[in-house]
C-alpha cells in the first residue's frame, strides 16, 4: 500500500488518505501492527520504508515531501510505532506546513480482563489544530 495514485472517488470527490509514517514491521513484542482498521479512514500511503533512515540520508526528507505533497486537513497521519523517530518528526512538519489542522489516528487498545491487549483495538481520529 504505497503511492496510491487514486485520490478521487467515482463522483470526483477527494478521497482522504492515511499517510503511514513507516511501513510496519515486527515489533519488540513479536507481532506486526495491523493497519486494516485504519483503511476505513482512507487509502493507506506509506511514507518511509523499513530500511529508510532519514536521520542519516538527507535526500529522504524531500522524498517524503513529494509523497505528502497533496496532504490536506481531510487526510490523516498514522505512526504504527518503530522506525526512525526522525521520520515521525519530518511527517509532522510536512503535514503542519500543508494544513492548519492535522488529523492523526491513535491506536486504542481493547481492555480485556483488566489488561490492555496491544494487538487488539481500533484507530481513533484526533484533530490537532496547529494554527487558525
Model-derived features with residue positions:
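Acidic, metal-coordinating catalytic cores used for nucleic-acid/nucleotide bond scission
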Residues: 79-89
Amino acid at each position: 500500500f504505497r503511492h496510491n495514485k487514486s485520490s478521487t472517488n467515482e463522483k470526483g470527490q477527494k478521497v482522504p488518505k492515511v499517510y503511514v509514517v513507516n511501513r510496519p514491521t515486527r515489533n519488540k513484542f513479536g507481532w506486526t501492527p495491523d493497519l486494516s482498521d485504519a483503511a476505513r479512514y482512507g487509502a493507506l500511503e506509506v511514507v518511509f520504508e523499513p530500511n529508510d533512515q532519514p536521520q542519516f540520508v538527507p535526500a529522504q526528507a524531500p522524498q517524503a515531501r513529494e509523497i505528502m505533497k497533496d496532504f490536506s486537513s481531510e487526510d490523516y497521519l498514522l505512526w504504527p510505532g518503530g522506525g526512525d523517530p526522525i521520520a515521525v518528526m519530518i511527517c509532522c512538519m510536512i503535514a503542519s506546513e500543508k494544513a492548519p489542522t492535522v488529523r492523526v489516528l491513535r491506536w486504542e487498545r481493547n481492555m480485556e480482563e483488566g489488561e490492555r491487549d496491544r494487538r487488539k483495538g481500533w484507530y481513533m481520529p484526533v484533530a490537532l489544530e496547529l494554527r487558525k
